């Protein structure tokens, strides 16, 4: 369960004939408007993120600091029919609001997560669109980028320990893959993209599901010719994960 946060402000707005709302961190942002969630509003200060995702993320240069704007998009076959609309179940159940609040809860627990700045949704009858704005982590590379080069052995151990920390807090990450694990120049690991994530009672089934998804991601990135290397590297990660889990850290 995500606790109430007194620093959150929910501001309703109208966009044309549509109604929506913006949930934001009043300590980081003094004013908000719908344009913050539209790449064209930023003009030359918005740059598309080239790696991962579905062409739905931009780096933006803002007065409150560099940030990442991500619009929620569907994947798979359903995206051919409905790219970016979701069934309306109430504002508090929109994907952007849920992710914003989950990230703030994870930060309150001391976990390495970028700071969410604002979340937005616009209603379209029984459907809605959504977007989220968060702090940009500077000087980081994704695990996907690292494995295409020469990733250091210590990275695998650090990543394994980081995942164990999140799992011990009950985070079931819906899309744990190599694009969503970041490392900075000091070796610090970060986890991103908490869409559809949830806090649960720690259990073997969903923890193993997360780890299996990460392994599939690594195999996909490095290809069939690197299968043995992928399994060797992942075994290092897994040993560090298991050791951290057994020690309760």
UniProtKB/Swiss-Prot annotation:
Keywords: ATP-binding, Cell inner membrane, Cell membrane, Kinase, Lipopolysaccharide biosynthesis, Membrane, Nucleotide-binding, Transferase. It is a peripheral membrane protein. It catalyses: an alpha-Kdo-(2->6)-lipid IVA + ATP = a 4-O-phospho-alpha-Kdo-(2->6)-lipid IVA + ADP + H(+). The keyword Secreted does not apply. It comes from the Bacteria. GO terms for biological process: lipopolysaccharide core region biosynthetic process; maturation of SSU-rRNA. The keyword Electron transport does not apply. GO terms for cellular component: cytosol; plasma membrane; preribosome, small subunit precursor. The active site is at residue 175. Its EC number is 2.7.1.166. It holds the Pfam family Kdo. It is an enzyme of class 2 (transferase). Pathway: Bacterial outer membrane biogenesis; LPS core biosynthesis. GO terms for molecular function: ATP binding; protein kinase activity. It is found in: Cell inner membrane. HAMAP family: KDO_kinase. Catalyzes the ATP-dependent phosphorylation of the 3-deoxy-D-manno-octulosonic acid (Kdo) residue in Kdo-lipid IV(A) at the 4-OH position. Belongs to the protein kinase superfamily. KdkA/RfaP family. This is 3-deoxy-D-manno-octulosonic acid kinase.
